[in-house]
Amino acid sequence: PGYKGLVILDALKTTNVVWKNSGTTLYNVGDEVLNLEFHTKMNTMGAEVIEGINKAISVAEKNYKGLVIGNEGDNFSAGANLGMLFMLAGNREFDEINLSVQAFQNTMMRARYSSIPVVVATSGLTLGGGTELSMHADQVRAHTETYMGLVEFGVGIIPSGGGTKEMTLRTSDMYKKGDPELNILMENFMTIATAKVATSSKEAAAMGLLKHTDKHTLNRSSLLSEAKNDVLNLYNEGYTQKKQRQNIKVQGRAGLAMFEAGITSMLYGKYISDHDRKIANKTAYVMCGGDLSQPGYVSEQYLLD
């Protein structure tokens, strides 16, 4: 559908809508592929977008070859809808916060462990939850002008939708025999702790936010069409449902001690605030796998919890 095989969502609004809610629309873009579009303000991800992602995966698993998540706007997503979280925090509704974080995590994990290929097509701002969703896709089709980053630190929280877990997993995958593992861990920790945003898809790959199997596209107008082709390629290669990882190497107490010393000296040097220290320690705790007496191997779910 669209011009010369290009996917143009605007042209499909009257004929090819499969499902919609207030924040998302699910289109049939032909060849048994679906496309989920966000249309909240700045494409932020609140409850309606989480519902949309889950619905899209359910529909695709029943009747389609796979799913693209992407839109034709300037930005893929400015991240999770934090307004809602701050409101709940202000009202001290911490159980509600835990539930919404859990729902977000479960949705990210579902994107990765569904029975169909999920390709995320990114462009422009792809921040926070937008980055986390990309990190959990089977593949990303990134426009070269994709500005990606786990920016939650900047607003005083840790990336809790699976971004911290995913950085820990990718750190573990980078370890080679004889490597100074703590140095690699520190580098990836700093990507989160400085809320660094990549200025291009190539830089996002260098930062470890995109995988070497993710693809880059120069032409913005062909982004969704290329993402659709990626879905079909994955399907035709005999896509099989993945199993959750159980072999993520974490450093335990040895890593934690290194981080705590560094973070405390930054606090005393007045480089960071007391709250920054709290968030940095929490991130380090997750990335080191908690208070383990020695380095070991843990599962994805262990890190999320």
Language model regions located:
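Short acidic-aromatic active-site loops that bind/stabilize oxyanions
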Residues: M42-N43, A47, E93-V101
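Conserved strand-to-helix beginnings and helix N-cap segments that scaffold or border functional pockets
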Residues: A47-I50, G79, T131, G161
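Single, functionally critical "micro-switch" positions that shape active/binding sites
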Residues: M45, A80, A137
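Short, histidine-centered active-site or binding-site loop motifs used for metal coordination
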Residues: E37-T40, A89, E152, G208
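Conserved catalytic cores of soluble enzyme domains
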Residues: I97-V101, Q105, M109-Q246
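A structural preference for short, pocket-lining loop segments at secondary-structure junctions
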Residues: D31-L36, I50-D95, Q105-A121, H143-Y147
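Intrinsically disordered, low-complexity segments enriched in small/flexible residues
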Residues: P1-G70, R170-S200, H212-D214, L218-D305
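Short strand->helix junction
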Residues: M42-N43, N75, L125, I157
